[in-house]
Amino acid sequence: MRRPLSLLRLGAMLMKEFNHMRRDRTTLGMMVGIPLIQLVLFGFAINTDPKALPTVIYSADSSAYTRSFTAALVNTGYFDVVAEARSEDTVDDMLARGQVQFAVTIPQNFSRDLVRGQRPQILVEADATDPVATGSAISALEQIKLRALSRDLLGVALPTPPSQPAFNVVVHRRYNPENITQYNIVPGLMGVVLTMTLVMITGLAVTRERERGTMENLLAMPVRPMEVMLGKILPYVIVGYVQAVIILIAAAVLFGVPVEGSVGLLSASTILFMVANLAVGFTFSTIAQNQLQAVQMTFFFFLPSLLLSGFMFPFRGMPLWAQTIGEALPLTHFLRIARGILLKGNGFTEIFPDLLAILAFVIVASGIAMARYRQTLD
């Protein structure tokens, strides 16, 4: 005979589970923390219409018309003039390094041709490795072409009809002329996949030993903490490298992503990036008490990496505090490296700042991992 539902017994089971949740503070913190992080990031940090994009001006014509055009650019809210270049080489270098999103070239004799009604052309070069970041700003250029300089040209007898703009704006999408989204997504996908898999797999490394009861055997082995750490990490470096090669081949063959730079340089950068993620995973494995906690910590690290690195949303569209957090994440710098090498043909000089940032992260994460492992030994 089946017993009827007892509210007393049900209440006892509920209290038992709540007590278990209260004791497992790590899991409880993840249950509360991850939704809060999602709320904050999606509510405040995500912006698909970035403003104040860094812009460099290269002007061979110093006139009131040039200054008025520059002011019209800034007034749209999409362009922030951060530098004035002295040569075209400087413009190319700033675009390649990712220091600016736009480069505006005003030709010589611009004001003279303007007054003569010859409709001079202004060249606007956009770093189109992230099409979403530049889309709205490029659309704003059409309004500038129609409205800018209209007040300055009042009273000037122009040979061109009033219905036509006094000058043309030629937009050149650098590194991605056809505005293909896959050129932005696929190189970044390599970093996202490596982050997700390597942090999780390594995060389970030590916790698996603890759950199986073989942790004591590992601690009794006559090996140094660094040797244990390398022994746990190096097999996954090989696995991660195979993943990266498969993704790179698929990017070139299936999606037609160009490979403008050195594959060897990208491979070396990928190894450093993998070590950074493996160090994070090893740190989590020394903190987590079980494999569930290790997986939860992985998502706790992966979610900000995915949203704040510039993979899904424009990095420059985020507020300063979100960009600061993003700069501390290795995925942010690897995305710049991968896109820079594949799409821009960047060399070691251009990617060195991002390599340095990843190396600094490796040193800090490895130091924390070794310190935590020594505590485990004690």
Segments the model singles out, each with a brief description of its role:
Residues 205, 283, 342, 357-378:
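Junction motif at the cytosolic side of a transmembrane helix
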Residues 21, 98, 199-223, 233, ...:
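Transmembrane helix boundary and interhelical loop/hinge segments in multi-pass membrane proteins
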Residues 45-49, 203, 207-208, 221, ...:
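Short helix-capping/hinge motifs at transmembrane helix termini and TM-loop junctions
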Residues 225-299, 303, 348-355, 359, ...:
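Alpha-helical transmembrane segments and their short interhelical loops
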Residues 182-202:
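Long, hydrophobic alpha-helical segments
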Residues 33, 41-50, 288-328, 332:
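Transmembrane helix segments
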Residues 1-183, 350:
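Extracytoplasmic/periplasmic domains immediately adjacent to an N-terminal transmembrane anchor
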Residues 175-179, 258, 310-365:
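Membrane-interfacial helix-loop-helix junctions in multi-pass membrane proteins
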